[in-house]
Each structure stands twice: as C-alpha cells, then as structure tokens.
Regions:
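N-terminal basic, Ser/Thr-rich segments that initiate or prime the first beta/alpha elements at protein or domain
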Residues: 1-144
Length: 144
C-alpha cells in the first residue's frame, strides 16, 4: 500500500494517479552505453562508465518507485523521495493555479513539470511527471 492509499480521509477515493516519466532513466542508459562502447578502447574506462551508469540507474529507479502523484475526490496528494521525503497534500478548494511546463520533446513523449500554487503561499514544482496535462485536467475536473 502506497503513501496515497494509506493517507486517505474517510469517504475519499483516488480519482487519478500519475508516475514519474521513464525519461529519468535516459542519463544512466547513455552512460552505460558509453561504458559498453569503451570496452573496445580500455577495460578500466568501460568498467568505470558502466558502474557510474548503473549507480545512476539505481537512483532513477528509487526515485521512480518512491514518487506518487494523486488526485482524490478531496485533495491533491504528492509524495517524492525515499530517504528525504517531500509531501504535498492540498485540498482541492485551496488550489489557486496549476501550470504545466513542457518542452517540444516533453510534448512528444508525454512528460513535463507541474507547478501547483495554493492559498497561503504554497508554491511547489514537480519535474518529469508523466502526462502532466491529464493530471491538471483531473484536478480541474474534481475542483468543479
């Protein structure tokens, strides 16, 4: 059971859940490929590049598995981080603005950054969210 499921209020249901986009694995994949390519040049260099790539992949995997983005019938609930956890639980009626930032590549592959602004000065930015426009649409759909 995830963070969102374990923190639901009475009579609250999950309407939509999103994840981090698989783009977070690009950097590690490129470094591992460089390591494999370097096998032809130098074994130590190849081992170092592959090791760094695998470490980056492990970090991306932990980030992917430990991040939750959800819209419920009453709130927006977001949790990121494993060791250093950051959470946002914002009542739908307190959401003032939602903005989505996507590059051209982000629009083509379906990822982007989401900025939530709430009453009381809450201003949070979350990067590399899969389908951020759908996430925003679901928040608007529940808020009305």
């Amino acid at each position: 059971m995830g963070y969102i499921e374990s923190n639901l209020l009475p009579d609250e249901q999950i309407v939509y859940k999103a994840n981090l986009h698989w783009k977070i694995f690009w950097k590690s994949s490129i470094v591992v490929l460089v390591g494999i390519f370097c096998l032809a040049i130098h074994a130590i260099l190849a081992g170092a590049a592959t090791g760094i790539g695998l470490a980056l992949a492990l970090r991306a995997f932990i980030d992917y598995k430990s991040s939750e983005f959800g819209v419920t019938t009453k709130r927006v609930i977001i949790k990121v981080g494993f060791i250093r956890r950051r959470t946002l639980e914002l009542l739908l009626r307190q959401v003032e603005a939602i903005s989505v930032d996507q590059s051209m590549l982000g629009r083509m592959l379906g990822f982007g950054s989401l900025t939530l602004t709430g009453t009381g000065g809450v201003h949070e930015v979350f990067h590399n969210i899969s389908s951020p426009l759908e996430f925003r649409r679901r928040i608007h759909g529940q808020a009305t």
